[in-house]
Design a protein with these regions (language model features):
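Cationic, low-complexity basic patches in intrinsically disordered or flexible, solvent-exposed regions
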Residues: 355, 369, 386, 390, ...
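N-terminal leader/auxiliary helical segments
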Residues: 1-92, 97-367
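Short, intrinsically disordered C-terminal tails of secreted or membrane-associated proteins
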Residues: 411-415
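Aromatic (phenylalanine/tyrosine) cluster motif
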Residues: 362, 367, 372-374, 393, ...
Length: 416
């Protein structure tokens, strides 16, 4: 799985390439479309995660079986409103398959296999899962930034969680056809609903920046023992690791061959493949010709990207160092000047505060002995204290008796 936000972003990009009818159906049933885009992964968060592994073909199952059952259900549906809703879910489901098939070989080439038999012990399994979460969370951050979206404002899953019309029809539609496709004698609808609730809840929690920073600090203090918990948190204040952004090729984790491909190329290919998949689904719903659909949508394992393989076949990956996947903090304040404002402006009336906000900017001068960024006052000694208070990091150097470096700085300001 690339994570949920990546799947929704790609679903929207793929939507632009669809037929007018498909665009209308998905536009009128956005909640169903987005639910379909993340449905493959929902079971991973619940009590039966192997149901998700099965959907991805990880156990050797045909990844198209559920698709065909759902499309036959859509063909038999007589209610136009429900049919459009179900079609939208299927189209989102197809987009997920296309994105996973395209991106997962690269993801696993960096994260390594999570299957116990491919690892010497549980510690290595957990490391692979940690790397996997880091990679997919970074992909979310990358595509959000590329689209100019923010975690604070981009909330596609509110509608998924709150749309009563969709939740009354789609979960049972999906689960009943899942049961038919794989011959499961169990009502999976409550399992799916509970799993998706957890999925959406974790998605919200991992967007909490203060909590993420606190956990990262604790993880560093504990030598990485919180890796699994920390790796899923979004890092809005950090830059995406070069190993995930600037690559030009990667070693396929199953075949071992060198795949010449970049992040931009993977993005382009995922959108193109999703367009083909949904066009094939739309055609099948209209004419019911199975052979044409199976030719357009091969039985690719969604983890390996290779036909007729299992998750355990990932044996040739070259995992990256976890430390290289954490990203470096963006030191934006070192590239921008501070705004100087009068002493006490933080507690002043609105007029003075506005005046302070409109004050001119001054460049930062890192002080050699302390490395502390200091904005020199525009005039003599009287502006030293306000400028220091304005910086907000340490007390004014004039009153830092135990800081000779700052006393020296103060003296220099006096002489100037």
């Amino acid at each position: 799985m690339p994570r949920d936000l990546t799947h929704v972003i790609f679903a929207e990009d793929i939507r632009k390439n669809l037929s007018a009818e498909a665009q209308r159906d998905t536009g009128e049933n956005t909640a169903a479309f987005h639910m379909g885009a993340i449905a493959h992964d929902a079971f991973l968060y619940g009590s039966q995660p192997k149901l998700a592994t099965k959907l991805h073909g990880g156990l050797g199952d045909d990844t198209r079986a559920v698709m065909i059952e759902m499309m036959d259900d859509v063909r038999a549906e007589k209610d136009p409103e429900k049919q459009a809703m179900k079609k939208s879910f299927v189209y989102g489901f197809m987009s997920h398959a296309a994105v996973d098939t395209t991106f997962h070989p690269f993801v696993y080439s960096v994260s390594g296999s999570q299957v116990p038999e491919n690892n010497p012990d549980q510690k290595h399994v957990d490391l692979a899962k940690t790397r996997h979460r880091y990679i997919e969370t970074w992909l979310d951050v990358h595509f959000l930034r590329e689209k100019g979206l923010s975690l604070d404002t981009f909330k596609p899953f509110k509608q998924v969680a709150n749309d009563k019309r969709t939740n009354a029809v789609v979960p049972s539609f999906f689960c009943e056809n899942y049961e038919k496709a794989y011959g499961i004698d169990q009502d999976l609808t409550p399992v799916f609903k509970n799993s998706m609730k957890i999925q959406l809840f974790i998605g919200r929690v991992t967007q909490n920046q203060p909590l993420g920073k606190a956990l990262r600090a604790l993880d560093n203090a504990l030598d990485g023992r919180l890796g699994l918990a920390v790796s899923g948190f979004y890092q809005a204040d950090r830059a995406m690791p070069p190993v995930l952004k600037d690559f030009e090729s990667y070693k396929h984790p199953v075949t071992g061959r060198n795949v010449v491909q970049s992040l931009r190329g993977l993005t382009r290919d995922a959108v193109a493949l999703g367009t083909v998949y949904i066009a094939a689904a739309e055609k099948y719903i209209k004419d019911g010709v199975t052979k044409a659909f199976l030719k357009a949508v091969p039985n690719c394992n969604l983890d390996t990207g290779v036909e007729n393989t299992k998750l355990a076949d990932i044996k040739l990956a070259t995992p990256a160092d976890v430390e290289k996947l954490k990203g470096e903090k963006i030191k934006a304040f070192m590239r921008k000047g501070f705004k100087a404002f009068p002493c006490g402006a933080r507690n002043a009336d609105p007029a003075r505060r506005k005046q302070a906000d409109n004050a001119p900017e001054f460049p930062l001068i890192p002080f050699k002995r302390t490395g502390f960024p200091y904005a020199p006052p525009p005039t003599g000694l009287r502006r030293v204290q306000p400028a220091c208070e304005r910086a907000g990091y340490r007390p004014c150097p004039r009153f830092s008796a135990k800081r000779p470096a700052f006393r020296h700085l103060c003296a220099r300001a006096v002489s100037e």
